[in-house]
Amino acid sequence: MSNLILTPSNNGTERPYRSRKTRPCDNCRLRKSRCVVESIGNPCLLCTQLKIPCTYHLPPIKRNKQKKQQDSVSDDTPSEATTTTNDDRDPKYNALGNNLDAVRGKVISPTQGSDARGPDGRQVPLNLAGITEMYHTSDDKFDKLGLDDSLNYPYVLGPTCDSDIDLIREYFSFENGVCSFDNMTVKYVSTSSKSPVMYILDPAYENDRHSDFSRYDHALHDLLSTYIDEATGRTLVNLYFSHVHPSYPILHGPRFLLSYKNGSRNVPSILLAALYSVALTYWPSDSRSFGAPPLDQRKMWTIVEEGLNFHFTQPRLSTIQAALLYLISRPLHNMYSLSSILSRTTVLSQLLGFNHDCTEWKIPNEEKTIRKRIWWAIFIADKWYSMYFGLATNIHEDDFVVPKIESDESLPLEITSSHSFKTFLKMIELSSLLQDILQDLFTVRALTRHSKNNRSISYQIIGFFTRLNSIRPVEFTEPALGVASLKIQFDAVEILLWKTALRFNLPDFQSADDLFVCVEKSVSNFVQITANSSGDFFWPYAGFHFSTLVSLLIRLHLDFHTNNTYGARAFSLLDAFVRHCITLHEAGFDFVEMAIRRSSSLLKELGKDHPHLLALRDDIFNSNDSRGEEAYNHVPEQLFDPWNPHSWTFPKSD
């Protein structure tokens, strides 16, 4: 045990044991944990269990009280103490910080403030989105609950949990809303008598597990730094904040960018890997990227999936954010794996209290904003994957009380397109409608009930059509990211209602004209997507919609094949739709892959009894590629051992 105690300096003396309450050891202080020393001369319990040196008996380092800052943003330049990290002292990572220096008080444009150049000598622009050196990444205000890089497990004490919250509230002494006992810390964030909320921060005492976690984190960082150089990393971060973040703002952009500026290892490895993976989608379509992609995106997503499976055992805020990036960009290859990630992310968010209304909590406003955005992003994923997988939802109406996000609710120093942000808000509104549709029409009990009463379901569908039309947005006057995808998602809900009406053969929905108007509008919105749209933000559920639309077009053609008018219209729409899918696929728009494979298999099977469908299939696929349908076959993905990064054989960028 003696090797765990640091020897005091020659000019210092040991601190008296009675000073423990006012000055814990450095490790306990950083972890905000109670420093317990059973006897003088021994290390504290936490350092003993973690097998790390204890500084309790060293002379305390003199602390200079800093001036109060304005809610994480100051007009002063950050001091060296607030910006220095282990990576800053490493020359390998210092270069990145030097090249990302911001012009104080100004927004860095894509053509200034960067000295990094790519392999071909082209300058790599950096869009810091309004971030300057005034922003303090080490400001402790944002992460008082240990949701990010802390070694604590924060979770909400629910009213029925084994911890007696009434006993704790009435008989324990809280100082500034915090009470520490038995190496655990309980923190009040809401003292409301109706819905009090307490967090418990339980130190991570699993020594071997923590060692594995640290080893994995360093290994993944080493892998990323090996295959993604400084200029490429800057480009990928730029692509993410240019193409994804405006319509999907789940990251604290200012804090992330300045953390990345101070060294890529300041960003949790799983979040950085997920962000790089998302950004690779836009590598071919953005003029700021050059050459071949530095990594294979599908292999990167496999790594992220393996990493999430590990990080879920020691979750942080970055774990949820990485999972959300996985859920919006991961190409569908395994429904079970994706459903598992979604379910665990949902439960984890509830464990950390994201389903509560944090408006009156005693936490920084920035954290309130991020919490709301993350919860609604999880809500969106839960509803849409539930719809297309045909599974029960993980989130029910009574499970959350999170208010909607206001259109002017932004973070300090955050600069984003208001139109793109509104597409995110409108998607939340549409997903709320989808929740009611799934709950009222598609639960097991609802399906049983409606099979006996068609009139009831007819009234409900009419009501849902009315609500859908009332929230459908008018045309945006200015172009914005996510607009095309938002139109597709509205079409998807409308088609879902029509398919339900057809399934129950409801008398109020027998007009073929109205049905074809809906389908033609969906195909028209799809055809408006061009090869240049590959740089736009699309929700991943668009791929399911395209596949569903193919099936519906074939069904309509067969249902009306004796009708020269409707049968011919459906056949013409099917022909145009599949050909446009192939055109987009050749331009790198991979959301149509599922629809192409679905159309090929359906036309082949149904062509046995309907030769004209087989002729259509042969004409479409053989005329576009000499390999025929084999050109669109799914390529099996390679699996990797996350503990052996050297086996991940990615080609380095030239």
UniProtKB/Swiss-Prot annotation:
The answer to whether keyword RNA-binding applies is no
One GO molecular-function entry: DNA-binding transcription factor activity, RNA polymerase II-specific
The record's annotation in Pfam families points to:
Fungal_trans, Zn_clus
Renumbered to this chain, region (Disordered) spans 1-23, 63-96
Major place of residence: cytoplasm
Keywords of the record, alphabetical order, are: Cytoplasm, DNA-binding, Metal-binding, Nucleus, Transcription, Transcription regulation, Zinc
What InterPro entries does the record point to?
Carb_Metab_Trans_Reg, Transcription_factor_dom_fun, Zn2-C6_fun-type_DNA-bd_sf, Zn2Cys6_DnaBD
Residues in the DNA-binding region are 25-54
Q: Does the keyword Ribonucleoprotein apply?
A: no
Here the segments flagged for biased composition (Polar residues) are 1-13
Q: Which CDD domains match?
A: fungal_TF_MHR (cd12148), GAL4 (cd00067)
Give the UniProt subcellular location, in the record's own words.
Cytoplasm; Nucleus
Q: Which GO terms describe its biological process?
A: DNA-templated transcription; regulation of transcription by RNA polymerase II
Question: According to its record, what are the GO cellular component terms?
Answer: cytosol; nucleus
**Matching PANTHER family:** GLUCOSE TRANSPORT TRANSCRIPTION REGULATOR RGT1-RELATED-RELATED, TRANSCRIPTIONAL ACTIVATOR PROTEIN DAL81
- Designated name of the protein: Uncharacterized transcriptional regulatory protein C25B8.11
